[in-house]
Amino acid sequence: MSTTKRSVTTRPSTSSRNVPRGIWELARLHTRESWLCWYPSIWGACVAAGVSDTVLEPLAFARFLFGIWASVTATHCAFCTFKSVPFCFFVVPRYSSDYWHLDKHVQRCKVRPLPSGMISTPEALLAFVCWVPFTFAITWATLGPAVTVSFIPVWVLSVIYPFMKRLMPFPQVVLGAIIGGAVFPGWVGVTGDLDHLDQALPLFFATAAWVVYFDVFYATQDLPDDKKAGVKSLAVWMGPNVKILLAGLGILQIAFFAMTALRADLSLIFWILGIGVWAVSVPWHVLSLNLKDRHSGGSVFKANIKLGLYMTGVSLLELVLLRVHHAPMKVY
């Protein structure tokens, strides 16, 4: 670990109790992390329009995008809160709450709301309980019943995910399925079809590979602490060979994005500005990772937030130029 970087700061004692801010930060609303979750839904909608040859009416599609943003953000808030609550000891009583409270064991995370004392565990649990009906209601109200049904696998896997960091060496695979699964609500919102979601699988696999990829970069920040605490991750499992894994995941992303573009008959806009730029970014990410500097992985993770935003912009550009016209669109 580099000794030249700034050390992790701790919160002053005067700010240790701040429940509203604690709820805000537990939901990760002070970060851009939720962006990584709604990108795939927008990709799903854009690709579905190509596969189904759907013409979209601008205002209806704008309302749909708002629904996707609101629903995915609420889902992210709810389950980030859930992930932070060390309640798992109620389910597995032979372990203490500290065993499941991973933030206490990671230096970078000790300033988060629960370990810093900003909010108590019962208060955090109550916040999660409040997020659940809100998430369901906003999804149903803005996107309708079919899209709400397509969210169910995402919600179920989000309940399972926090346990996986203690129970399996590759929890990022579960996270990949969760965020990759956000492709399907976007797809269903355009097609209204829950029966032919196999058409969305190439995009799902591209997204899932990308999620595992960027989360492995993120996990390299905490390698010393994770090893000491027994936290499981692909970064810990692969150790010094992690760059081989990252390169393989990069190849998978590009291959599945190419398959997606072929099946949806996407234009050169997506091929050149989207896949082309993505293919150049992957080797740059892998070569930029310095395992001796725990801040290196965090920098590449942030670069992937920007890359996902860029791909979302490219997808919307192609959609607007080719498929958004003044014609009726039914949002399901």
From Swiss-Prot:
Origin superkingdom? Eukaryota
List the effects observed when the gene is inactivated. Loses the ability to produce yanuthone D. Also leads to the loss of production of yanuthone X1 which does not have 6-methylsalicylic acid (6-MSA) as a precursor.
* Catalytic activity, EC: 2.5.1.-
Offer one Pfam family short name for this entry.
UbiA
Major location category of this protein: membrane
How is this protein situated with respect to the membrane? Multi-pass membrane protein
Record field: transmembrane: 42-62, 72-92, 145-165, 170-190, 200-220, 242-262, 266-286, 300-320
Needed co-factor(s) = Mg(2+)
Biotechnological utility: Yanuthone D is an antibiotic against C.albicans, methicillin-resistant S.aureus (MRSA), and vancomycin-resistant Enterococcus.
Q: In which pathway does it act?
A: Secondary metabolite biosynthesis; terpenoid biosynthesis
Q: In its UniProt record, which GO terms are filed under biological process? A: terpenoid biosynthetic process
Q: Where in the cell is it found?
A: Membrane
What span is annotated as the signal peptide, if there is one?
A: none
Q: Which UniProt keywords apply?
A: Magnesium, Membrane, Transferase, Transmembrane, Transmembrane helix
| Keyword Transmembrane set for record | yes
User: Which EC class is the enzyme in?
Assistant: transferase
Q: List the InterPro entries.
A: Prenyltransferase (IPR039653), UbiA_prenyltransferase (IPR000537), UbiA_sf (IPR044878)
Question: Which family does this protein fall into?
Answer: Belongs to the UbiA prenyltransferase family.
Q: Which PANTHER family match?
A: 4-HYDROXYBENZOATE POLYPRENYLTRANSFERASE, MITOCHONDRIAL, PRENYLTRANSFERASES
Biological role stated in the UniProt entry: Polyprenyl transferase; part of the gene cluster that mediates the biosynthesis of yanuthone D, a fungal isoprenoid epoxycyclohexenone that acts as an antibiotic against fungi and bacteria. The first step of the pathway is the synthesis of 6-methylsalicylic acid (6-MSA) by the polyketide synthase yanA. 6-MSA is then converted to m-cresol by the decarboxylase yanB. The cytochrome P450 monooxygenase yanC then catalyzes the oxidation of m-cresol to toluquinol.
Instruction: Output this protein's name.
Output: Polyprenyl transferase yanG
